[in-house]
Amino acid sequence: DIDHIAKTVADVIKISKATGGLGVSVTKLRATGSRLATSNTTSTGPTPFAKIMDTAIRAIQRGGKKKGALCFYMENWHYDFPDFIDWKHNAGDDYLRMRTANTAAYISDEFMKRAKKGEIWYMFDPKETPDLVELYGAAFSKRYAEYIEMAERGEMKLWKKMPADQMLRQILVALQGTSHPWLTWKDSMNLRALNNNTGTIHMSNLCTEIA
């Protein structure tokens, strides 16, 4: 929803001005190429919207003393996660890089199990899989497997796959080269949360203390 995105950008600016550090989840943003029914066009994906916030925290300094601080979180089943891994790379198109904000991968136990076993990892458009972001633990694994079956039957419009251990290597290579993305753990954070009856935790804070 474009209004929600615009409000998030405004909130980032206001909180940064008030010296706050932020964590922002971009997992719910549509995938690149996702069909927009209202305009009969396709989405540009999370990167351009993240770039707006990245630029904003550089422009709006915290208390006028130092640059704003923000960390973007994305779950690695998102269709654009391979691009997310590259957000902090020094090389490449500056429009596709985050020069001020940090990045953190929000990883499920299901992914780590698949990486350990050498299995395949699937990535989806959150528009087609809106409940995945709200699920964790066994419920996530069950629903994720259902979406995989749907994709292989040709019932999903936008999806791709790769070996899970290959994705893990890409994350670790980027982490070694750029110190990003940080690794945070969706299942651990939600299963151990004292208030997990109030809803799903979609991210950590700026410095990932609760991860």
State where each predicted segment sits.
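Active-site cavity-forming subdomains of large catalytic enzyme subunits
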Residues: 1-211
